[in-house]
Amino acid sequence: MKKVVKLNNIKIGNDLQFVLIAGPCQIEDEDHALFMAEKLIQLTSKLSIPFIYKSSFDKANRTSINGIRGLGIEKGLEILSKVKSEFNCPIITDVHSESQCTDTAKVVDILQIPAFLCRQTDLLKAAAKTGKIVKVKKGQFLAPWDMKNVQTKLEAFGAKDILFTERGSCFGYNNLISDMRSLAIMSELNVPVVFDATHSVQQPGGRGGSSGGERKYVELLAKAAISVGIAGIYMEVHQDPDNAPSDGPCMIKLDHLESILIKLKKYDKITKEE
Protein backbone atom coordinates (compact mmCIF):
# COMPACT_ATOMS: atom_id res chain seq x y z
CA MET A 1 0.00 0.00 0.00
CA LYS A 2 1.41 3.38 -0.98
CA LYS A 3 2.26 5.67 1.91
CA VAL A 4 -0.04 8.59 2.60
CA VAL A 5 0.94 11.23 5.16
CA LYS A 6 -2.03 12.86 6.85
CA LEU A 7 -1.88 16.44 8.13
CA ASN A 8 -5.16 17.75 9.51
CA ASN A 9 -7.52 17.43 6.54
CA ILE A 10 -4.70 17.18 4.00
CA LYS A 11 -3.55 13.87 2.56
CA ILE A 12 -0.07 13.81 1.03
CA GLY A 13 0.66 10.95 -1.35
CA ASN A 14 2.22 10.33 -4.73
CA ASP A 15 -1.09 9.09 -6.19
CA LEU A 16 -3.20 11.91 -4.71
CA GLN A 17 -3.82 15.49 -5.81
CA PHE A 18 -0.64 17.47 -5.39
CA VAL A 19 -0.13 19.64 -2.32
CA LEU A 20 1.41 23.10 -2.66
CA ILE A 21 4.09 24.10 -0.16
CA ALA A 22 4.78 27.79 -0.69
CA GLY A 23 5.74 31.08 0.90
CA PRO A 24 8.56 33.61 0.96
CA CYS A 25 12.12 32.34 1.37
CA GLN A 26 12.55 33.95 4.78
CA ILE A 27 10.34 35.57 7.38
CA GLU A 28 10.84 39.30 6.85
CA ASP A 29 8.40 40.70 9.41
CA GLU A 30 4.96 39.92 10.80
CA ASP A 31 3.02 42.07 8.35
CA HIS A 32 4.74 40.52 5.35
CA ALA A 33 4.22 36.98 6.61
CA LEU A 34 0.52 37.59 7.23
CA PHE A 35 0.15 39.29 3.84
CA MET A 36 1.79 36.41 1.98
CA ALA A 37 -0.11 33.75 3.89
CA GLU A 38 -3.44 35.46 3.24
CA LYS A 39 -2.78 35.82 -0.49
CA LEU A 40 -1.61 32.22 -0.85
CA ILE A 41 -4.54 30.84 1.13
CA GLN A 42 -7.01 32.85 -0.95
CA LEU A 43 -5.46 31.59 -4.17
CA THR A 44 -5.19 27.92 -3.19
CA SER A 45 -8.74 27.97 -1.79
CA LYS A 46 -9.98 29.40 -5.08
CA LEU A 47 -8.19 26.66 -7.02
CA SER A 48 -8.98 23.87 -4.49
CA ILE A 49 -5.31 23.02 -3.97
CA PRO A 50 -4.22 21.72 -0.53
CA PHE A 51 -1.76 24.23 0.93
CA ILE A 52 1.05 24.34 3.50
CA TYR A 53 2.71 27.67 4.33
CA LYS A 54 6.51 27.79 4.28
CA SER A 55 8.99 30.39 5.47
CA SER A 56 12.34 30.30 7.28
CA PHE A 57 13.45 32.03 10.48
CA ASP A 58 17.14 31.55 9.63
CA LYS A 59 18.94 31.12 6.32
CA ALA A 60 21.97 29.53 7.92
CA ASN A 61 23.87 28.69 4.72
CA ARG A 62 24.00 32.06 2.97
CA THR A 63 26.88 32.36 0.49
CA SER A 64 28.39 35.47 2.08
CA ILE A 65 28.85 36.69 5.64
CA ASN A 66 26.95 39.77 4.46
CA GLY A 67 23.87 37.79 3.41
CA ILE A 68 20.70 38.56 5.38
CA ARG A 69 19.90 35.47 7.45
CA GLY A 70 16.51 36.29 8.91
CA LEU A 71 14.82 37.15 12.21
CA GLY A 72 16.09 34.20 14.24
CA ILE A 73 14.23 31.38 15.94
CA GLU A 74 12.46 33.26 18.74
CA LYS A 75 10.92 36.03 16.64
CA GLY A 76 10.46 33.75 13.65
CA LEU A 77 8.45 31.16 15.56
CA GLU A 78 6.39 33.91 17.14
CA ILE A 79 5.39 35.11 13.66
CA LEU A 80 4.74 31.60 12.33
CA SER A 81 2.53 30.97 15.36
CA LYS A 82 0.58 34.13 14.50
CA VAL A 83 0.16 32.96 10.89
CA LYS A 84 -1.09 29.59 12.09
CA SER A 85 -3.60 31.02 14.55
CA GLU A 86 -4.77 33.75 12.18
CA PHE A 87 -5.42 31.49 9.19
CA ASN A 88 -5.58 27.98 10.67
CA CYS A 89 -3.15 26.70 8.06
CA PRO A 90 -0.40 24.10 8.45
CA ILE A 91 3.17 25.37 8.64
CA ILE A 92 6.58 24.05 7.60
CA THR A 93 9.97 25.56 8.42
CA ASP A 94 13.63 24.55 8.45
CA VAL A 95 15.68 23.41 11.41
CA HIS A 96 19.48 23.56 11.29
CA SER A 97 20.54 22.07 14.62
CA GLU A 98 19.30 19.56 17.17
CA SER A 99 18.65 22.34 19.68
CA GLN A 100 16.07 23.97 17.40
CA CYS A 101 13.85 20.93 16.93
CA THR A 102 11.87 20.84 20.18
CA ASP A 103 10.87 24.51 20.22
CA THR A 104 10.13 24.55 16.50
CA ALA A 105 7.94 21.45 16.79
CA LYS A 106 5.73 23.29 19.30
CA VAL A 107 4.69 25.69 16.53
CA VAL A 108 4.97 24.03 13.13
CA ASP A 109 3.47 20.88 11.63
CA ILE A 110 6.43 19.77 9.51
CA LEU A 111 10.15 20.04 10.26
CA GLN A 112 12.26 20.50 7.15
CA ILE A 113 15.85 19.28 7.01
CA PRO A 114 17.91 21.42 4.57
CA ALA A 115 19.66 19.66 1.70
CA PHE A 116 23.16 20.40 2.99
CA LEU A 117 22.24 18.70 6.28
CA CYS A 118 20.35 15.66 4.98
CA ARG A 119 22.93 13.16 6.27
CA GLN A 120 23.41 14.72 9.72
CA THR A 121 22.39 11.82 11.93
CA ASP A 122 21.93 13.78 15.16
CA LEU A 123 19.73 16.34 13.44
CA LEU A 124 17.60 13.62 11.87
CA LYS A 125 17.30 11.97 15.28
CA ALA A 126 16.23 15.17 17.01
CA ALA A 127 13.64 15.90 14.32
CA ALA A 128 12.26 12.36 14.42
CA LYS A 129 11.97 12.39 18.21
CA THR A 130 9.54 15.34 18.07
CA GLY A 131 6.91 13.10 16.50
CA LYS A 132 6.28 15.65 13.76
CA ILE A 133 6.29 15.00 10.03
CA VAL A 134 9.90 15.25 8.82
CA LYS A 135 10.58 16.50 5.31
CA VAL A 136 14.13 16.01 4.07
CA LYS A 137 15.59 17.74 1.05
CA LYS A 138 17.89 15.46 -0.93
CA GLY A 139 21.38 16.91 -0.93
CA GLN A 140 22.62 18.35 -4.21
CA PHE A 141 25.52 15.92 -3.83
CA LEU A 142 23.44 12.80 -3.16
CA ALA A 143 22.13 10.07 -5.46
CA PRO A 144 18.38 9.52 -5.10
CA TRP A 145 18.81 5.88 -4.08
CA ASP A 146 21.05 6.99 -1.22
CA MET A 147 17.99 8.59 0.39
CA LYS A 148 17.19 5.05 1.54
CA ASN A 149 19.85 5.56 4.21
CA VAL A 150 18.15 8.76 5.35
CA GLN A 151 14.83 6.92 5.52
CA THR A 152 16.38 4.10 7.55
CA LYS A 153 17.87 6.56 10.04
CA LEU A 154 14.59 8.40 10.52
CA GLU A 155 12.60 5.20 10.96
CA ALA A 156 15.17 3.88 13.45
CA PHE A 157 14.61 7.03 15.50
CA GLY A 158 10.84 6.58 15.45
CA ALA A 159 9.70 8.80 12.58
CA LYS A 160 6.37 7.60 11.20
CA ASP A 161 5.71 10.25 8.57
CA ILE A 162 8.51 11.17 6.17
CA LEU A 163 8.57 13.32 3.03
CA PHE A 164 11.47 13.60 0.58
CA THR A 165 12.21 16.55 -1.68
CA GLU A 166 14.16 16.82 -4.92
CA ARG A 167 15.86 20.20 -5.34
CA GLY A 168 18.39 19.58 -8.09
CA SER A 169 21.84 18.02 -8.34
CA CYS A 170 25.23 19.65 -8.77
CA PHE A 171 26.17 19.99 -12.43
CA GLY A 172 29.64 21.43 -12.65
CA TYR A 173 30.28 24.69 -10.84
CA ASN A 174 27.54 27.17 -9.86
CA ASN A 175 24.84 25.10 -11.50
CA LEU A 176 22.16 22.53 -10.74
CA ILE A 177 20.30 20.13 -12.99
CA SER A 178 17.03 18.28 -12.38
CA ASP A 179 16.98 14.56 -13.11
CA MET A 180 13.30 13.63 -13.10
CA ARG A 181 14.20 9.97 -12.61
CA SER A 182 15.07 10.98 -9.06
CA LEU A 183 11.39 11.54 -8.29
CA ALA A 184 10.47 8.04 -9.42
CA ILE A 185 13.43 6.47 -7.61
CA MET A 186 12.58 8.14 -4.30
CA SER A 187 8.90 7.25 -4.76
CA GLU A 188 9.95 3.60 -4.88
CA LEU A 189 11.03 3.97 -1.23
CA ASN A 190 7.30 4.34 -0.44
CA VAL A 191 7.76 7.94 0.67
CA PRO A 192 5.68 10.87 -0.64
CA VAL A 193 7.93 12.98 -2.86
CA VAL A 194 7.91 16.75 -3.35
CA PHE A 195 9.65 18.74 -6.10
CA ASP A 196 11.27 22.04 -5.13
CA ALA A 197 10.76 23.98 -8.34
CA THR A 198 12.43 27.21 -7.24
CA HIS A 199 15.63 25.98 -5.61
CA SER A 200 16.12 23.64 -8.56
CA VAL A 201 16.83 26.67 -10.75
CA GLN A 202 19.33 28.10 -8.28
CA GLN A 203 22.90 28.88 -9.35
CA PRO A 204 24.77 28.32 -6.06
CA GLY A 205 27.27 31.10 -5.46
CA GLY A 206 26.68 32.19 -9.04
CA ARG A 207 26.90 35.88 -8.21
CA GLY A 208 30.10 35.68 -6.23
CA GLY A 209 28.73 36.90 -2.92
CA SER A 210 25.26 35.42 -3.43
CA SER A 211 23.46 32.74 -5.41
CA GLY A 212 21.84 33.39 -8.74
CA GLY A 213 18.92 31.66 -10.36
CA GLU A 214 16.92 31.21 -13.55
CA ARG A 215 13.32 31.94 -12.58
CA LYS A 216 12.14 31.50 -16.17
CA TYR A 217 12.59 27.72 -15.86
CA VAL A 218 10.55 27.22 -12.69
CA GLU A 219 7.26 26.56 -14.49
CA LEU A 220 8.89 24.26 -17.03
CA LEU A 221 10.49 22.09 -14.35
CA ALA A 222 7.36 22.07 -12.20
CA LYS A 223 5.28 20.78 -15.12
CA ALA A 224 7.86 18.09 -15.86
CA ALA A 225 7.92 16.99 -12.22
CA ILE A 226 4.14 16.92 -11.87
CA SER A 227 4.00 14.72 -14.97
CA VAL A 228 6.00 12.04 -13.15
CA GLY A 229 3.27 11.70 -10.52
CA ILE A 230 4.34 13.16 -7.18
CA ALA A 231 2.85 14.27 -3.87
CA GLY A 232 3.66 17.95 -3.92
CA ILE A 233 5.24 21.03 -5.42
CA TYR A 234 7.36 23.37 -3.32
CA MET A 235 7.78 26.94 -4.54
CA GLU A 236 9.08 30.04 -2.86
CA VAL A 237 6.91 33.03 -3.72
CA HIS A 238 7.25 36.78 -3.16
CA GLN A 239 5.33 39.85 -4.30
CA ASP A 240 8.63 41.52 -5.30
CA PRO A 241 11.27 38.80 -5.67
CA ASP A 242 13.91 41.05 -7.20
CA ASN A 243 14.02 42.98 -3.94
CA ALA A 244 13.67 40.03 -1.57
CA PRO A 245 16.41 39.54 1.05
CA SER A 246 17.30 36.03 -0.19
CA ASP A 247 16.79 33.74 -3.19
CA GLY A 248 15.14 36.50 -5.21
CA PRO A 249 16.38 35.21 -8.60
CA CYS A 250 14.65 31.87 -7.96
CA MET A 251 11.37 32.96 -6.43
CA ILE A 252 8.11 33.19 -8.35
CA LYS A 253 6.33 36.52 -8.40
CA LEU A 254 3.05 36.28 -6.52
CA ASP A 255 1.11 37.72 -9.47
CA HIS A 256 2.36 34.91 -11.72
CA LEU A 257 1.53 32.02 -9.39
CA GLU A 258 -2.12 31.52 -10.33
CA SER A 259 -1.45 30.85 -14.01
CA ILE A 260 1.26 28.33 -13.09
CA LEU A 261 -0.97 26.49 -10.62
CA ILE A 262 -3.83 26.25 -13.12
CA LYS A 263 -1.49 24.50 -15.55
CA LEU A 264 -0.06 22.24 -12.85
CA LYS A 265 -3.56 21.13 -11.85
CA LYS A 266 -4.21 20.04 -15.44
CA TYR A 267 -0.93 18.11 -15.68
CA ASP A 268 -1.54 16.49 -12.30
CA LYS A 269 -5.05 15.39 -13.23
CA ILE A 270 -3.95 13.84 -16.51
CA THR A 271 -1.04 12.00 -14.89
CA LYS A 272 -3.09 10.54 -12.05
CA GLU A 273 -6.04 9.51 -14.22
CA GLU A 274 -3.87 7.06 -16.16
Curated annotation (Swiss-Prot):
GO terms for cellular component: cytoplasm. The keyword Phosphoprotein does not apply. It is an enzyme of class 2 (transferase). The keyword Cell inner membrane does not apply. SUPFAM superfamilies: Aldolase. Signal peptide: none annotated. Keywords: Cytoplasm, Lipopolysaccharide biosynthesis, Transferase. Coiled coil: none annotated. It catalyses: D-arabinose 5-phosphate + phosphoenolpyruvate + H2O = 3-deoxy-alpha-D-manno-2-octulosonate-8-phosphate + phosphate. Belongs to the KdsA family. HAMAP family: KDO8P_synth. This is 2-dehydro-3-deoxyphosphooctonate aldolase. It comes from Rickettsia typhi (strain ATCC VR-144 / Wilmington).
